[in-house]
Regions:
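TPR/TPR-like (Sel1-like) alpha-helical repeat modules
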Residues: 335-339, 374-381, 404-427
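Metzincin-family zinc-dependent endopeptidase catalytic domain
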Residues: 89-193, 197-203, 312
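Metalloprotease/metallohydrolase-associated module, dominated by Zn2+-dependent proteases
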Residues: 12-19, 62-63, 144-181, 199-309, ...
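Helix-turn-helix repeat elements of alpha-solenoid scaffolds
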Residues: 269, 282-298, 325-337, 366-378, ...
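Structural signature of alpha-solenoid helical repeat scaffolds
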Residues: 306, 346-347, 387, 427
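Disordered inhibitory propeptide/activation segment of secreted metzincin zinc metalloprotease zymogens
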Residues: 11-77
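C-terminal motif of bacterial Sec signal peptides marking the signal peptidase cleavage site
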Residues: 6-9
């Protein structure tokens, strides 16, 4: 805490210095990828998970209610069409294997020209966003191609609330983004294509949350999907019917959740807070309006009496946006408070790491490289376990700058090279890698090259 108090006293925008010029892409190390997945079971009671399941399965992100559950019956087939990037093959194979192993879902890939339950179509990002400007990627029912979607997008055909059973759906993903962005889209959109359609900001350990902290399906997500395809539930199950079935169903699937005591049920999230967060983080809003919306989200969270992830996320969003307005002291104060909330719970270690990266950046720009190294080292394992290559690369590049400042140039060079391997997966293009490396180099107040 003393380190952070000292850091707060030094808060201010980082110096704008010319950055280190990264090597050409041909000189970069090979792309690094995550080869193993650490399964972490849910850390909440089954009573809380049952409430989460109901809110995920019987409501849309817009707030519209769904009258009953829909799901696929029988084996689920997946095909890929369009110009898919090379990174898709191992990432999709790993995801399908996890769904079979952890969620017990019979799902497998078929040829591109075969009929399939789920079509994953790749297309240029510009083409996708011409029709759906706010979407990085998305899933639609009753269509099997982009052309189908174009023709049906203003009709009831792509309305999930009118769907009696899932027979075929299509996922649309840009093929010209980083490997990590492709993988993240795969996880979130395939989970919603076959499972619940809603996202809940209150969930601390889930991809079914628009805060985007978790980018690969978690143990909680796999439990939700396993329950979604349990024999006790079926197409047409209503919310009341699911409410009666879930206690015994979850006791069977997740016996450890029966042993977790305490009241971990969370209050509903008011629409005003969601609207404020979406205004703060969505496109097409002026910077000053974004800051005001984030401040409003913080105020609503405090009024609600929250001390959970929703207040922390409000503060995190406000901290990032205030930083963009060159308000370093306000930004750091928001990050520090968000970090304290996230650090209080083991289940939010991934969120803590995101906050820590920003605090470490303040330490670096304040000329405190030893503090930056301590902060980063405390979170690297959590970032690795969360499989976020972009965040991992950023933190390692920051650590390399800090070590340079401390005179450990040989160690800094080795860590920087390791970071660039992760950057190739997390950021993709040479230009993106260059930009990120330069941004972090600018944090070093001593750098003049």
């Amino acid at each position: 805490m003393a380190l952070l108090i000292t850091l707060a006293a030094c808060a201010g925008p980082g110096p704008e210095m010319p950055g280190r010029r990264p090597p050409a892409l041909a000189d970069l190390p090979p792309m690094k990828t995550f080869v193993t997945h650490r399964v972490t079971p849910p850390q909440r009671s089954n009573a809380a998970i049952a409430q989460d399941f109901l809110d995920l399965a019987f409501q849309m992100e817009s707030g519209r209610s769904l009258p009953y559950m829909t799901r696929f019956e029988g084996p689920i087939t997946v095909r890929v069409t369009g110009p898919a990037p090379a990174s898709l093959e191992p990432d999709l194979a790993a995801l399908l294997a996890r769904l079979r192993r952890e969620a017990g879902i019979g799902i497998h890939r078929v040829a591109a020209d075969a009929p399939a339950s789920v079509t994953i179509e790749f297309l240029p990002r510009s083409q996708l966003q011409r029709l759906v400007p706010q979407a990085a990627c998305f899933v639609a029912p009753r269509v099997s191609s982009w052309e189908d979607f174009r023709q049906s997008r203003r009709s009831g055909e792509v309305d999930w609330t009118t769907l009696p059973v899932r027979q075929w759906v299509a996922i649309f993903i840009p093929g010209d983004v980083s490997p990590q962005e492709v993988r993240d889209c795969l996880h979130e959109e395939l989970a919603q294509a076959i499972g619940p359609l809603n996202d809940l900001y209150r969930l601390p350990d889930s991809v079914f949350n628009d805060d985007n902290f978790h980018t690969v399906l978690t143990g909680f997500d796999m439990l939700i999907l396993r329950a979604y395809y349990a024999p006790e539930l079926h197409n047409g199950t209503t919310r009341d019917e699911a409410t009666r079935v879930l206690p015994q169903l979850l006791a069977r699937l997740n016996p450890r959740g029966e042993r977790i005591g305490g009241s971990d049920l969370m209050s509903p999230t008011p629409r005003a807070w969601i609207d404020a967060i979406e205004a703060a983080l969505g496109p097409g809003t002026a910077p000053s309006q974004r800051v005001a919306a984030a401040r409003s989200a913080v105020e609503i969270a405090r009024t609600q009496g929250w001390r959970d992830t929703r207040l922390a996320f409000s503060l995190f969003a406000f901290g990032r946006l205030a930083l963009g307005q060159n308000n370093g002291e306000t930004s750091l104060a928001a990050f520090l408070e968000a970090g304290q909330i996230y650090a209080a719970h083991p289940v939010t270690r991934v969120q803590s790491a995101h906050v820590a990266m920003h605090i470490a950046a303040f330490a670096l720009s304040a000329g405190q490289p030893d503090t930056a190294v301590l902060i980063i080292d405390d979170h690297l394992d959590d970032v690795q376990n969360g499989e976020n290559a972009a965040l991992l690369a950023s933190m390692l590049l920051m650590k390399a700058e800090a070590l340079d400042m401390l005179g450990w140039t040989k160690e800094a060079a080795a860590i920087r090279r390791d970071a660039l391997g992760w950057a190739r997966y997390g950021f993709g293009s040479e230009n993106e890698v260059r930009e990120r490396m330069a941004e972090i180099a600018w944090l070093n107040p001593a750098r003049t090259d």
